Amino acid sequence: MIIKPFNAVHIGLFVFAAAVIMLLYFCLSRTKEKTRRWVIVAICIANIVGFLIYKVALSHDADFLRISGIVRFNWWNELPLQLCNINMFLIPIGLLTGRRSITGFSFFVAPLGAVMALVFPESAFCGYSLFLPRMLGFYGTHIVIFICGISLATLGIYRPRLGDFPGIYLTLCCLAGGAHAVNLILRRTVCPFANYFYTYPADISILRLFWRWIPCPLLYLLPGLLILGAYMLTLWGTFALCEKAGASFGKHHKK
């Protein structure tokens, strides 16, 4: 089962994700919100464990090193500090602390980061069997992040608001700036190719395009803010329409 962007296996993965999101909704929609929160937290914890197993397997994958052009596996380059996998921690933190700003960031950014990773994978994760350990780890962890992010809204834990957008942008910019600082430190010490949040150009088609437009570390990601804005508006509008339709249906049903 070879997987690459938009082939049958790749599309099937997103169909599977949609099915899981619907299943979670039908199984949990009538439960207490506390129960729904803990289910999402438990899924994230399981995903963190899976992520660690995936990285251990990756550290022994000679093919991954060859394709990526890396001489030796470096754990400092595999920390969960990317735009998508950092949400494995942010989602539980937001749910357990009740911080709306964190939960809102995870709802909008976690699915987008996961989708970007899955649609524009690095060379080592494109065109190989889905059943290779590194492929299962990469696609598995990202699809679970996508499911958890979307489920924050479908389960009624978080309701998107336009007023959340400025805080989400601020949070993203702070995290990106912090990631770039981490990259600068690691590149000068223990990991010369550290690239969290991809603040330096990477072997990803859309990022290569951004770099051609703005050949400057960190700043070359600015076009991504436009994509994020369009994505957030789309999600907000979709959920607003669904809520309105649901309310109208409920009102009509009562009559």
PLM ranges: what are they?
Residues M1-F16, G163, G167-Y169, C174, ...:
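Membrane-interface transmembrane-helix boundary segments in multi-pass integral membrane proteins
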Residues H10-S29, C44-K55, A176, H180, ...:
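Hydrophobic core of alpha-helical transmembrane segments in multi-pass integral membrane proteins
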Residues V20-F26, L90-I91, V144-G163:
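Alpha-helical transmembrane segments in multipass membrane proteins, preferentially the mid-helix core
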Residues C27-I40, L96-G104, L155-P166:
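Membrane-interface helix-boundary motifs at transmembrane edges
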Residues A46-V56, A110-E122, L172-N183:
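Aromatic-anchored segments of alpha-helical transmembrane domains
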Residues Y54-I67, V119-L130:
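Juxtamembrane "helix-exit" motif on the non-cytosolic side of transmembrane helices
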Residues L65-P80, G127-G140:
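Non-cytosolic membrane-interface motifs at loop->transmembrane helix junctions
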Residues L95-G149, A153:
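Membrane-proximal helix-loop-helix units in multi-pass membrane proteins
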